[in-house]
């Protein structure tokens, strides 16, 4: 071995992350580890999977929720750059976060780059990147923002719970629009109705949610409350 030769952590892809245009196993492992960390940080349980989704809890709304469940599972299993953008809408405790986490796991396991974050945390990163006086904090936020803008699938949970400021609205538009322009896919969940979204955000954001996202309405009663009663 020539001491002048480069030494790579992954000799297969030479640390590029890709082999002949396809994601290398080393990068796949990194993305899987990162999305698992994100899910573990944000969710009470870190083992959400489609097999654990209990449709029996939905009562009269079961038939409608079966369609939602099947759509989410198919979306995750067949995810590609031709997949649609999804907007989950419905009240609290109906499984939006659970199913979005299920999608994140399957898509990541299939070798795609995935980011999963709450709207509050995601939009805060844009503000930190721009205004933080601490260089390291600003750099970390910049890395997070770049990852959210560029990953193949961005899952933005709980839109509408973030503190509404001009900066947050601007960041949300940048996130959604940049990903649309670059052909990156996004799944957004919210408790807000169409009317509430229009009242809270500007026309630019709402027109993109209306025109570029497929809406999945969630039905039923708060599952968390039902589980406490069982």
For each of these PLM feature ranges, what is it?
Residues 82-99:
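Walker A/P-loop nucleotide-binding motif
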Residues 98-112:
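P-loop NTPase Walker A phosphate-binding motif
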Residues 13, 43-44, 50-86:
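Pre-Walker A (pre-P-loop) alpha-helix and adjacent loop at the N terminus of AAA/AAA+ ATPase modules
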Residues 2-44:
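Interdomain "pre-motor" coupling segment immediately N-terminal to P-loop NTPase/helicase cores
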């Amino acid at each position: 071995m020539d001491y002048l030769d480069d030494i790579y952590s992954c000799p297969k892809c030479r640390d590029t992350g890709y082999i002949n245009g396809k994601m290398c196993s080393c990068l796949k492992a990194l993305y899987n580890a990162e999305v698992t960390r994100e899910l573990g940080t944000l969710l009470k349980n870190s083992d959400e999977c489609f097999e654990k989704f209990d449709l029996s809890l939905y009562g009269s709304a079961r038939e409608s929720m079966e369609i939602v469940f099947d759509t989410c599972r198919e979306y995750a299993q067949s995810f590609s750059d031709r997949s649609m953008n999804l907007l989950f809408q419905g009240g609290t405790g109906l499984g939006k976060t659970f199913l979005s986490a299920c999608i994140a796991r399957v898509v990541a396991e299939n070798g795609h780059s995935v980011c999963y974050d709450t709207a509050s945390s995601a939009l805060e990163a844009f503000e930190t990147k721009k205004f933080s006086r601490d260089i390291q904090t600003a750099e970390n936020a910049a890395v997070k923002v770049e990852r959210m803008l560029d990953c193949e699938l961005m899952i933005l949970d709980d839109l509408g719970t973030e503190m509404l400021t001009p900066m947050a609205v601007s960041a949300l538009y940048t996130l959604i629009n940049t990903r649309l322009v670059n052909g990156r896919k996004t799944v957004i969940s919210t408790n807000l109705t169409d009317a509430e979204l229009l009242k809270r955000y500007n026309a630019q954001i709402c027109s993109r949610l209306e025109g570029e996202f497929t809406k999945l309405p969630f039905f039923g009663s708060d599952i968390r409350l039902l589980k406490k009663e069982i």
